[in-house]
A protein has these predicted regions:
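Conserved RecA-like ASCE ATPase "motif II neighborhood" in helicase/translocase motors
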Residues: 141-196
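Conserved nucleotide-state-sensing and coupling region of NTP-binding domains
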Residues: 101-158
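ATPase catalytic-site recognition across NTP-hydrolyzing enzymes
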Residues: 252-325
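Walker A/P-loop
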Residues: 62-84
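Two-metal-ion RNase H-like nuclease active-site motif
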Residues: 146, 153-155, 317-329
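N-terminal accessory segments
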Residues: 1-65, 429
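Mg2+-dependent endonuclease catalytic cores in nucleic-acid-processing enzymes, primarily RNase H-like
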Residues: 223, 227, 231, 238-240, ...
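Acidic two-metal-ion nuclease catalytic site recognized across multiple nuclease folds
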Residues: 3-7, 465-481
């Protein structure tokens, strides 16, 4: 090379060593040779955040917080955090150790392999082959080491990492959007992080945990961690596709959004593109995966403005009751829900609706007191969902009280379909709420469905509406499990 080219080469190499963002831009062609690089402000922000953590760990300074990053899909998050960052960090200090994880072993290994492809590329070897190399006897797709004890281990959510430790623990999309619909999958991912992955730092006060993901459910890993006291232990970076929801974190990032359109990356996520995504993903998918708000206010299947608030109760109307019993009083499960309503002239008035967490004896004692308080008469009926303790509740109340109690039928449709069946009655304004402190909790759960943590109040509403549409349990009845 000529002196001019040698100088340019040396300057580029030095610049890449000094700045992870510059390394990201220069290494792009190695992993995406057919895709032109399009950069945006969030790339530099995330790169700078990771670089600061890397340099702090090298200096052996205590950390302030672990990190949660929520960004839309197709925003280059995995290439930055899981593919390129470990490679750049090894240039700075090849003794660093990484454990990375994704929702599937296939994806996790694919990302790990891309990191290794950079290391094996001619572009990289010309610049940093003298800094480190991959050991031949420790060179698997899911685990490889360099000649300075640096290690990269790729695992998946639910996978074992026994005996492994790292300076960086990276979780990249712990759930796919499809998996997020399963409470079991969500619980498994959250418990795996809490009980297995969380403890894998070599130095708990210095090493860092990094979670980068699109939001897919209110109870996904981000929601699980940010909903507890543990939120104080995490720096939360939230970059939604638009600034519509006021969900940008930290607030200082708001200045990077287009002042006219409110878009975070107009070149890739234009208004037209976002409209197409909204059509394809639906309201809930769009709210979570693009807006990073998986429980959008008043944008779900049930809207707040469908419900009128009444100041007066229908005094002469018969009050009926719906009971959706919980499996246990465990805080993790849905609570038991009780709903009182009247039905006159094809219109429902919800008199009261409460959530209670009570074991069987306390619940059986509570029910008679609550229904009497809410207007029970000899003409009233109490319908109990037969799941969990439902059958036993019916039997006990019939045996020990004079209440008119009836066991209902099991559901025949999925949750979304059951709500869809009653949506016309709701949207037409035929269901009102008697003014009370319970209104806000009730409306909050309804408007967040189906992404809300609990759906027991929704369950009761569906049962109440269907009860009158199809007539005293003789027709079609739909409600929640």
């Amino acid at each position: 090379m000529t002196n001019k080219k040698l100088l340019k080469f040396a300057l580029e190499k030095k610049l890449c060593e000094m700045s992870f963002y510059e390394f990201f831009k220069k290494a792009w062609h190695v992993v995406e040779p057919a895709v032109p690089l399009s950069t945006n402000w969030h790339h530099k922000y995330i790169c700078d955040t990771l670089q600061a953590e890397c340099e702090r760990i090298i200096r052996q300074e205590p950390k302030t917080k672990d990190i949660i990053i929520n960004v839309p899909f197709r925003s280059t998050k995995s290439l930055i955090v899981t593919v390129m960052f470990p490679v750049w960090a090894w240039i700075k200090s090849p003794k660093l150790r990484f454990i990375t994880s994704s929702y599937s072993a296939t994806l996790s290994i694919e990302l790990s392999t891309k990191s290794r492809d950079i290391i094996f590329s001619d572009w990289f070897k010309k610049r940093w082959e003298d800094v480190f190399h991959i050991k031949k006897d420790q060179n698997l797709k899911e685990r490889y080491e360099n000649n300075h004890i640096g290690m990269r281990r790729a695992t998946s959510v639910g996978g074992t990492v026994t005996g492994q430790g790292g300076d960086f623990l990276i979780v990249d999309d712990p759930l796919s959007p499809q998996m997020a619909n399963s409470a079991t999958e969500r619980d498994n991912a959250n418990e795996w992080y809490r009980t297995t992955f969380y403890s894998r730092l070599n130095q708990a006060d210095i090493g860092v945990r990094i979670i980068i993901m699109q939001r897919v459910h209110e109870e996904d890993l981000s929601g699980f961690l940010l909903d507890k006291e543990t939120r104080l232990n995490y720096k939360h970076i939230c970059i939604p596709a638009t600034n519509d929801d006021g969900n940008i974190k930290p607030k200082s990032l708001e200045k990077f959004y287009n002042k006219e359109t409110g878009l975070f990356w107009e070149d890739r996520f234009s208004k037209k593109v976002l409209d197409d995504y909204k059509s394809a993903l639906g309201t809930y998918g769009y709210a979570g995966q693009l807006q990073q708000t998986p429980t959008p206010l008043d944008s779900g299947m049930i809207h707040r403005d469908w419900f009128r608030i009444d100041r007066h109760k229908r005094e002469e109307a018969k009050v009926n009751f719906i009971i959706d019993p919980a499996y246990t009083a465990n805080q993790k499960n849905d609570p038991s829900a009780l709903l009182a309503y009247t039905y006159v002239d094809n219109k429902w008035q919800i008199v009261d609706c409460v959530n209670v967490r009570k074991e069987f004896p306390e619940l059986v004692k509570f029910i008679p007191e609550w229904v009497q308080k809410n207007g029970y008469t000899n003409k009233s009926r109490i319908y109990v969902e037969p799941k969990a303790s439902g059958k036993s509740i019916v039997q006990t109340l019939i045996r020990e009280t004079g209440l008119n109690v009836k066991e209902d039928k099991p559901p025949t449709k999925d949750k979304v379909a059951r709500v869809s069946d009653i949506s016309a009655s709701l949207e037409s304004g035929r269901v009102s709420l008697l003014h009370g402190k319970w209104n806000e909790e009730f409306l909050d759960q309804l408007t967040k469905f189906p992404a809300a943590k609990h759906d027991d109040m929704v369950d009761c509403l569906v049962m109440a509406v269907n009860k009158e549409i199809w007539g005293n349990g003789k027709g079609k009845i739909v409600y929640f499990n």
